[in-house]
Amino acid sequence: MAETDPKTVQDLTSVVQTLLQQMQDKFQTMSDQIIGRIDDMSSRIDDLEKNIADLMTQAGVEELDSENKIPATQKS
C-alpha cells in the first residue's frame, strides 16, 4: 500500500471537519426554524381554543361532563 502524504491527510481532515461543521450549522438552523414554527402553531392553537370557548359562551352553550353539549336554555 502506498504511503499517504501527511499534508494530504491534513488537508482531507480539514475538508471533512469543515464539511461536518457546515452540515451541523445547517441542521441547527433548520432545527431552530422547526421549533419556531411549532411554537407559532402552538400559540395559534391556543388562540383558536380561546376563541371557540368565547364563541360558545356567547352562544349560550355550556360544556357538560361528557362530550355532548346542549344550549343552556334547554337545561332543566
Curated annotation (Swiss-Prot):
Q: Which InterPro entries match?
A: HS1-bd
Give the location in the cell: Nucleus
Q: Which domain of life is it from?
A: Eukaryota
What are the UniProt keywords, alphabetically?
A: Nucleus
Q: Write out the function statement from the record.
A: Negative regulator of the heat shock response. Negatively affects HSF1 DNA-binding activity. May have a role in the suppression of the activation of the stress response during the aging process.
Q: What family name appears in the similarity comment?
A: Belongs to the HSBP1 family.
| Subunit composition and interactions | Homohexamer. Associates with heptad repeats of HSF1 trimers and probably also HSF1 monomers, and with HSP70. Association with HSF1 trimers and HSP70 coincides with attenuation of heat shock response and the conversion of HSF1 trimer to monomer.
- Protein name in UniProt: Heat shock factor-binding protein 1
Organism expressing this protein natively: Bos taurus (Bovine)
